[in-house]
Amino acid sequence: MNLVNLENILDNTSFLVLFLTMMIYWVGAAFPSVPYLQALGTAGVAIANLCIAALLGARWIEAGYFPISNLYESLFFLAWGVTAAHLIAQQMSRSHLVGVVTTPVAMGISAFAALTLPADMQTSAPLVPALKSNWLMMHVSVMMLSYATLMVGSALAIAFLFVTKGQNVELHGSSVGTGGYRTGVRLNKPQPVQETAIEGSGNVAVLNTTVVSDAPSLSLQRLSIADTLDNISYRIIGLGFPLLTIGIIAGAVWANEAWGSYWSWDPKETWALITWLVFAAYLHARITKGWQGRKPAILAASGFVVVWVCYLGVNLLGKGLHSYGWFF
């Protein structure tokens, strides 16, 4: 079996595994009493992650360079990053809710790469001279990982907005939160409650999260779900933002070496800056201004669209130094 055939098998396998895993998580959300579905879903994401890693490794061997130079390769690297971010978030939360949100994103990315892209865009080609640099791995890989983590965090924020739709919910406590499902803390009824500090492990004091709502009814289960989604969304975005910052700085250094200018207001650079500003505003609002609940979630949810425009929209327009030029 040659490497090209192996790549074709692996990309289709990763799509199939992610599709089945998505269905497992959705069934698990509908029937939470079934004990083994969450473990099965986590195993499915891990298998998909390994399949994509093997695909990228085979591509690296075949082409002789780090496989992130065209749209097909970057999409699968992005899918790998989303599955990796899922596993991190799953470890943080111990909740099946993460998979309900993240597996459709990863599955959609792999489906677009494996089933939609033209065959000529799925084949490897020699690198253009400008890409023959160690900065290719250092800059692009970090940017793609930041996109993956920010997408996951933003998708969880969208899920939070869906769960709290029509409710004036505000979560009070630390910015990190406690997570009702994750720690087993039973949230209070939707009315103002006095916060009490409890001592956590590692000499870190945390606050029991309480919820204030003007709405007449929001079940304790939905409050716990909302708390978990808000908590993990914040943590994952907090991981992705430094990666985005490092990636932009690395890109500026590479641009100066290649073209003699740190910043040229290329469409990709402009949208990367917009993305950075959106998530900087989100973190500033939560950490400095103390925003909680739906307001920061709306800001994070808008970041989901901004990241996709930055990554895919600008590229497919065929404009600028970062374009893949498929549609136009």
Curated annotation (Swiss-Prot):
Annotated GO MF terms: heme binding
Keywords: Cytochrome c-type biogenesis, Membrane, Thylakoid, Transmembrane, Transmembrane helix
A GO BP entry: cytochrome complex assembly
Cellular component, GO, one term: plasma membrane-derived thylakoid membrane
S-S bridge residues: none
Chief localization: membrane
InterPro entries according to UniProt: Cyt_c_assembly, Cyt_c_biogenesis_CcsA, Cyt_c_biogenesis_CcsA/CcmC
Subcellular location: Cellular thylakoid membrane
Membrane topology listed for this record: Multi-pass membrane protein
Pfam families per the UniProt record, alphabetical: Cytochrom_C_asm
Transmembrane segments: 15-35, 37-57, 68-88, 97-117, 142-162, 236-256, 271-291, 297-317
Assembly with partners or alone: May interact with ccs1.
NCBIfam families (alphabetical): cytochr_II_ccsB
PANTHER family per UniProt: CYTOCHROME B_B6 PROTEIN-RELATED, HEME EXPORTER PROTEIN C
Biological role: Required during biogenesis of c-type cytochromes (cytochrome c6 and cytochrome f) at the step of heme attachment.
Family that this chain belongs to: Belongs to the CcmF/CycK/Ccl1/NrfE/CcsA family.
Stated name of the protein: Cytochrome c biogenesis protein CcsA
Lineage: Bacteria, Bacillati, Cyanobacteriota, Cyanophyceae, Oscillatoriophycideae
